[in-house]
């Protein structure tokens, strides 16, 4: 019991319409590409001033995994953040009056083999390699330094540029290469490229997608809290402190545990669907979720493989069942806290809600344990039951 109280105290402390696009060879944009807009919060890793405005920028999936975020002020200064999946080489975005690569100016970014972030402006005088001139171009970059950042599997290029006139629709060139530029900054030939026409006058393109994703996150969180934060802990409490009500405690325990398992399974399924849509960089939350699915499945299978009370194996089964249950509840609580902290729409509501559930559960454990030690509850004889005592036809956890 002391171990469980410590686990929950630890968890409590931890808790403290798309713009118009046209292209000559743009691939079909699926839901997974669209939801790259919401995979990461740019304010978490981009420096100011990009971090101050990036979360409110219109977000447009353009081509393959290229995603464009932008904002423009009254002085025609545009803040642009372009991102794409990255392994090696370089990625770039260029601007051209006619949409042609020759004569365009481009911002190219990459992470060197030594892990250094590089970003340069290039002027494309022609199609030959020596005609792609580094540190030249017609883009009027502002005093704010351009930056390039690698976060998870995505690379982000951010810069500010001033255009002479406000043009709602602009030709944007996108390209990438898996080969690094030379030490002198000379670009290698691109592996693929495309040109798109972006309507920068539209600023509400991603609302419907974000709303859908936010709803799915809410469902995922509710299922996880109901399953791992409420039903399964209550089932464990019933198994430990209601055994003087035999066999009622057993049927209640089984009912709560199986219902909690169903809710937990639903949370995992919704989580997998969310991950496939938005590809977030959450290895800890995702890994613990899969780990919990394995543990909870083992608990269900253990129920059907429960040996008779008189057999020698029953003691070892009890140990297994109890400790797997305790470990599952601990990691379930930790993963709920991680999910709330990483949710971009979490707010105080989730923290207060789960904080209340966690506090009530912890208080119930403490009060009931005091009664159990005094012999008021916990066994038919009103005495503290021996360690791992089980009903002949039952299974317990925690």
Curated annotation (Swiss-Prot):
- Extract the Gene3D superfamilies matched here: 1.20.120.1770
Q: Which cofactors are reported in the record for this sequence?
A: heme b
- Give the way it sits in the membrane: Multi-pass membrane protein
Question: What organism does this protein naturally occur in?
Answer: Arabidopsis thaliana
Q: What is its main location?
A: membrane
> How does the record comment on the protein's domains?
DOMON domain could bind catecholamines and thereby could regulate the cytochrome b561 domain function. DOMON domain could bind one heme b.
Every copy of the Cytochrome b561 domain together lies at: 184-377
Pfam families in the record:
Cytochrom_B561, DOMON
Q: Identify the keywords attached in UniProt to this record, alphabetized.
A: Electron transport, Heme, Iron, Membrane, Metal-binding, Signal, Transmembrane, Transmembrane helix, Transport
Binding residues annotated for heme b 2, in chain numbering? 253, 321
* Localization terms from the record: Membrane
- Residue span of the signal peptide, if any? 1-23
Can you quote the record's cofactor note?
Answer: Binds 2 heme b groups non-covalently.
Write the protein's name: Cytochrome b561 and DOMON domain-containing protein At3g61750
Q: Which GO terms describe its molecular function?
A: metal ion binding
Domain of life, per the record? Eukaryota
UniProt cross-references to PANTHER family, sorted A to Z: CYTOCHROME B561 AND DOMON DOMAIN-CONTAINING PROTEIN, OS01G0680900 PROTEIN
> Membrane-spanning regions, if any?
222-242, 252-272, 287-307, 320-340, 351-371
InterPro entries according to UniProt: Cyt_b561/ferric_Rdtase_TM, DOH_DOMON, DOMON_domain
Quick one: which residues bind heme b 1?
A: 220, 285
**Record carries keyword Transferase:** no
- One GO term describing the cellular component: membrane
Give every DOMON domain span: 64-177
